[in-house]
Each structure stands twice: as structure tokens, then as C-alpha cells.
């Protein structure tokens, strides 16, 4: 990976002196070496035959020096993680698969692979095939008339998504998914690519996806992501892109380098409607494409991946010998403003609020916290005695930093940029100690979904095993926010059977349930566990889990409605107290564990 970045930075340097598009193309052809003749064949073919195809070929070739793929024996070892996870038993943790592959093949590192540059290897037949298929779907689809040439080049034409092995993927994927749109093409909405994308996403969501971010870091997988459905957000976004681009729908991937409220980056898909507006989705979790400005992600800075390098950024950065690695290869555009809408802010700090000496034009980085350190997510140039960052999303804590080529140093105090107002509030240590009550180790993610699924759930008592008649003793009105929620029941009536019944659409998600005869009791009532058998996907999330004493296991009913879990006490008992735990990500505070609080001031 390091050698690739060096090559890209070196190559970018060759282009910095280019003042015209022809010079960019000539420089790319010169870098092709012995492969120049193959690329020239493509240009010669289209120069007289089709002006648009010639321009498209120029676009691909002039940016080709910055693209390539990895190869080597270790690549197959890496791909095993994804292919074997498809059939790996649900009852076993993914770490078991990882450990097994490490024992068999050794530790994987991307440094074990060899990087092959497209400019030196892509032949004319390959390039012509992709150009012909891209133009076919662009010109034949009813929505193609709303896709301009520049959008086509950037978000339909590219033959690759990232650094995956080269392949002729368009024809096979087109023939597989095109029939889904046959009836749609006859409708009045057939000119809207967003509606077509919705139909395709409906089909893609039917697959069984297995999400994990625990696999080693490696290259993109290529179109095999469509048959494996395993990996993280990167693999799932790639799958969507292959299908949409094969059908001539302009799309791609937007991302944040680091989330404002989590120690991770994130990728998601975007699609452009017939007016060029951005709609986004996270496959397979979201059912519909939504407007970009409605995305509730903690923003900071949002970037759109592109095949073409940002030529203007290359020219601006050319005079700087030390640029933070994430910005040396600018295959992206800043699209923050598309997401922030009216909450699009400017962060401007004068030199009086910065530590150190800055000269006119010095680079300054905007940073978010990531795993005990600050990570740059944007840059600007120090001008007129201030560091000014345009288009920033709020709702996160930032700092500014300088980079010397080896390490960076914070040059401002941390500050909160308020999402709604854009106001900057600096974070300074308080002189006095404060008391905090913490219920979780980090912010809610999936837990929001799981916690909310308990809203509308009920605790019921009955003297009939089938609950043919029952009394509702508790209605859960709010999402639980702690590991154990204690609810006191007001009924004096004894019951032989008691249960928790989940609300419709919630798969009866619950982790722990306990019934107590008296409010002061610490030992729950015991009996025969009863409930609706069957759990979603893997048969390891049965109703029995609600009474196993382990808050890390849970009940996930096979159907969204009608699930319940409970207990037959053998004889009627009064129950004054119920304790329950929502299905969770093991994110709660556990008694007996040792925790350490870290302040952003000291990161």
C-alpha cells in the first residue's frame, strides 16, 4: 500500500505541470510504456467513429495512471474470509472463522500482494468492451436522457470501483438484473433513474447479508460481492454500484473518513435522480432511497469517491512536500453541502486561538477524534491570519492540527460545533469535579433499533397456558436505556402463567426477563420456560434465551409479529416486580468490570 501511494504521489507530480487536457492524456500515454500501443488503438478507433466515445476513452486513459489492482497468492487467502463466511454456521462466532483461516494460511497483510498498474496492463479489447457496454446502457435506457456526459463518465463509465481485479462484469450483471425493470420501462416514471434504482434495491435486499468488520484490511473484491453478500459497508456498497452502473444508473459511494460519534469510517451508496439530486441508502438496512439532507449521520466532512483525480486539488497541493496521506490521492470531491442543507457551517479560527506560528498558505487540518487520537478529515490553507473551513457539518467535537510529514500536533483547543446553530463552543477543563452517571460504554448504534423494539411490548398474566384470556400488567412506553430496567406491577392477582409479548414488527426482541414475587426479592421465580419457538436465521436466538441469566444472548423471533416468551410457575403466584433487558450489542455498563474515562482534552 505504501508503494502504491508513493507511485500515485509521484505520478500526480508529473501532471501538475499539465495546463491542458491534451497534456494530461499525453502524460498518461507516456507512463503506459510498452502498453501505449494498446491504449492508442482505442483512441484511434473512436476518434473518427464516435466523438463521445473518444472523449470517454480519453477520460478513462488520462486518469488510468492512478488506478490498479493487487495480485498474488495471498489474495486468494484474503478472499476466503468472504467466500467461506457465506456458509459458516450462524451458531458460531465469526472470530472462529478468522482464527481458522489464520492457522491455515497465516496472517494476511496487503503488503504480501503485488500492485499492477492499469496504465501498463489494460488492453484495447478490455477497454472497448467496457466503453461499448457503458454507452449501450446509457443510450438505451429511458432515463439516460437525463444523465449528462460528465455524470456518465464519472458514475457509469468506470470499469472499476476500487482496486479489485479487472473483469468484464457489465454484460453478465446487465442480463441478470435487466429483466427486473422490463415492466417499469413501460411506465410514466421510466425516465427517473432513482425509481429504477429502488426496484433494483428491493431485489438486492432479499439476499441474506452477513455483516462483519473483523476481517483483515485488503483490496476490493470485485463483482463476487454480489454472490457472497458478506463483509462490511464497503462490500455492500460495491454490490449496489455494480448492479446500478451495469443498468446505466448514475451512482457511487459517499463516505466519511471518520464518524463524528464513533471510532470508524463509513461508506454508503448514492444515486442521482433525473434532476441530478442525491438520494442515499445503506444496503441492506434501509428500504428506500432517502434525500441526502435527511441522513442523520454525524457529519463533519462528507466525500464522494470518483474515478477521476481532482486536478485542481493536485495543482494546489503540488507545492507542498508534506501532505497528510489521506489527501495525497484526491479521488474524491467534497459533497458536505449536499448533506448539511441549511445546517452547513463555516469554521474560522483566528491565529489568536491557534498555538504555534503559521505563515500565509500553511496547511491546517480539521480533525475528529478516532481511537484515542485525532484524525484529519479536511484541510485548508492559512490565509489572512485565520484558518477557515467551509462546508462543515456540526454535532461533533473537532480540533485543528498541523502535520509535519511524520506526525501531527493539535493547534487548537477541542471545540463542539453545534449542529443546529453552527456555534463553536470550546471545551476547557472544569475547575471542580463533576458526577456522571453512565449506562453505556459508547453511543447507541444498533442498540437504538433493539431498544426501540421494546416499545409497545407488554407483560401479561393468565391462568391459561394458551393465554386465551389474560390481563395486561405492564405496557412498555419508552425504550429502555440501562442494562436492567425494573418495573413494579400493581396487580394483587396471582397468575400461573406470565409472559412478555413483543409489539408487532419487533420480532419480540428481548435479552433478559425475570419475575419477582416481592419488590424486595433478589431471587426470581422459577418454572418451566414457555414461548413461541423459532428464531430468525440461525436458530440460536430462541425464547429460552430470555431466562438464561446472560444479557448478551437474546430472543429474536422468526416472525415480526406474535412472538412471546414467558414462564409457567406450576401454580399461581403474585408478581410485584419485573426486570427486563433489551436485546443489545453488549454496550451497557456491567457490574464488576473496570472502566476508564478518557478526556478529549488529553487525546
Give each language-model segment a name.
Residues 386-399, 403-406, 492:
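Short Pro-Gly-centered beta-turn/loop motif in secreted/extracellular proteins
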Residues 24-33, 46-48, 183-203, 212-223, ...:
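Hydrophobic/aromatic-rich core segments of domains that either
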Residues 360-379, 461-465, 469-470, 475, ...:
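Short amphipathic beta-strand segments in non-cytosolic proteins
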Residues 405-431:
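Structured interaction patches on ligand/partner-binding surfaces of diverse proteins
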Residues 343-356, 603:
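A short, amphipathic beta-strand motif
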Residues 431-471, 479-600:
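Aromatic, loop-rich ligand-recognition surfaces of beta-strand-rich domains
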Amino acid at each position: 500500500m505504501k508503494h502504491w501511494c508513493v507511485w500515485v504521489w509521484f505520478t500526480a507530480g508529473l501532471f501538475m505541470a499539465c495546463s491542458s487536457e491534451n497534456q494530461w492524456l499525453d502524460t498518461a500515454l507516456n507512463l503506459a510504456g510498452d502498453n501505449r500501443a494498446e491504449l492508442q488503438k482505442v483512441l484511434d478507433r473512436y476518434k473518427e467513429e464516435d466523438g463521445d466515445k473518444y472523449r470517454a476513452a480519453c477520460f478513462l486513459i488520462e486518469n488510468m495512471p492512478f488506478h490498479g489492482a493487487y495480485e498474488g497468492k495471498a489474495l486468494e487467502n484474503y478472499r476466503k474470509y468472504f467466500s467461506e463466511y457465506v456458509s459458516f454456521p450462524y451458531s458460531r462466532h465469526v472470530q472462529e472463522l478468522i482464527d481458522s483461516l489464520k492457522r491455515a494460511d497465516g496472517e494476511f497483510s496487503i503488503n504480501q500482494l503485488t500492485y499492477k498498474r492499469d496504465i501498463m496492463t489494460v488492453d484495447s479489447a478490455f477497454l472497448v468492451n467496457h466503453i461499448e457496454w457503458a454507452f449501450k446502457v446509457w443510450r438505451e435506457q429511458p432515463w439516460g436522457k437525463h444523465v449528462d456526459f460528465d455524470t456518465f463518465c464519472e458514475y457509469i463509465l468506470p470499469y472499476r470501483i476500487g482496486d479489485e481485479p479487472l473483469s468484464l462484469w457489465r454484460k453478465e450483471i446487465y442480463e441478470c438484473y435487466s429483466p427486473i425493470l422490463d415492466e417499469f420501462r413501460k411506465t410514466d416514471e421510466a425516465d427517473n433513474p432513482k425509481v429504477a434504482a429502488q426496484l433494483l434495491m428491493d431485489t438486492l435486499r432479499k439476499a441474506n447479508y452477513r455483516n462483519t468488520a473483523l476481517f483483515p484490511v485488503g483490496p476490493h473484491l470485485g463483482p463476487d460481492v454480489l454472490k457472497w453478500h458478506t463483509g462490511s459497508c464497503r462490500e455492500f456498497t460495491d454490490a449496489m454500484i455494480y448492479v446500478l452502473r451495469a443498468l446505466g444508473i448514475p451512482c457511487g459511494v459517499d463516505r466519511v473518513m471518520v464518524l463524528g460519534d464513533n471510532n470508524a469510517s463509513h461508506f454508503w451508496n448514492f444515486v442521482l435522480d433525473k434532476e441530478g439530486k442525491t438520494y442515499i441508502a445503506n444496503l441492506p438496512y434501509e428500504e428506500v432511497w432517502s434525500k441526502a439532507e435527511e441522513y442523520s449521520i454525524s457529519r463533519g466532512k462528507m466525500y464522494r469517491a470518483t474515478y477521476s483525480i481532482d486536478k485542481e486539488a493536485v495543482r494546489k497541493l503540488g507545492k507542498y512536500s508534506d501532505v497528510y496521506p489521506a489527501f495525497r490521492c484526491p479521488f474524491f470531491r467534497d459533497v458536505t453541502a449536499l448533506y448539511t442543507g441549511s445546517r452547513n457551517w463555516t469554521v474560522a479560527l483566528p491565529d489568536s486561538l491557534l498555538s504555534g506560528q503559521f505563515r500565509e498558505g500553511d496547511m491546517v487540518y480539521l480533525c475528529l477524534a478516532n481511537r484515542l487520537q485525532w484524525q484529519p478529515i479536511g484541510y485548508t490553507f492559512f490565509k489572512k491570519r485565520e484558518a477557515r473551513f467551509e462546508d462543515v457539518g456540526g454535532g461533533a467535537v473537532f480540533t485543528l492540527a498541523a502535520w509535519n510529514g511524520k506526525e501531527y500536533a493539535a493547534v487548537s483547543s477541542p471545540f463542539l460545533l453545534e449542529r443546529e446553530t453552527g456555534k463553536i463552543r470550546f471545551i476547557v477543563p472544569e475547575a471542580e469535579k463533576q458526577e456522571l452517571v453512565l449506562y453505556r460504554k459508547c453511543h447507541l448504534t444498533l442498540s437504538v433499533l433493539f431498544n426501540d423494539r421494546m416499545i409497545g411490548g407488554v407483560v401479561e398474566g393468565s391462568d391459561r397456558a394458551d393465554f386465551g384470556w389474560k390481563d395486561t400488567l405492564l405496557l412498555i412506553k419508552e425504550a429502555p436505556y440501562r442494562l436492567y430496567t425494573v418495573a413494579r406491577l400493581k396487580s394483587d392477582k396471582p397468575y400461573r402463567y406470565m409472559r412478555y409479548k413483543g409489539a408487532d414488527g419487533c420480532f419480540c426482541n428481548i435479552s433478559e426477563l425475570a419475575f419477582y414475587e416481592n419488590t424486595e426479592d433478589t431471587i426470581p421465580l422459577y418454572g418451566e420456560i414457555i414461548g413461541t419457538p423459532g428464531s430468525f436465521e440461525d436458530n440460536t436466538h430462541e425464547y429460552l434465551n430470555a431466562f438464561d441469566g446472560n444479557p448478551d444472548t437474546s430472543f429474536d423471533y422468526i416472525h415480526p409479529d406474535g412472538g412471546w416468551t414467558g414462564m409457567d410457575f406450576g401454580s399461581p403466584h403474585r408478581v410485584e416486580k419485573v426486570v427486563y433487558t433489551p436485546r443489545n450489542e453488549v454496550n451497557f455498563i456491567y457490574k464488576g468490570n473496570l472502566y476508564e474515562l478518557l478526556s478529549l482534552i488529553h487525546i
